[in-house]
């Protein structure tokens, strides 16, 4: 049985580009006034982007994007919905920190990669 990788790669590329449509439409509609915003598909992505930004900024894994509190010896934080899902946020945060990419761009890029 011969695998047809080209079809799979073409489908992945199509889905990645298609997932960028909301962001491209935002850029088109707002033009130079887009102010660094990004289009999101789910209501919890705002808090998730805040958590990723905190990791990019070097804050600890156990931080709360809703209250802004960080884990410290004086105020230890419990595990949260965000801190237990550390693989995906760090997959976005580490390259962003190294390359100097803002969280809004990483959320857009991450969405395209997830769609592919």
What is the role of each PLM region?
Residues 17-116:
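Active-site lumenal/periplasmic loops and adjacent helix-entry segments of GT-C-fold
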Residues 1-11:
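N-terminal membrane topogenic signal
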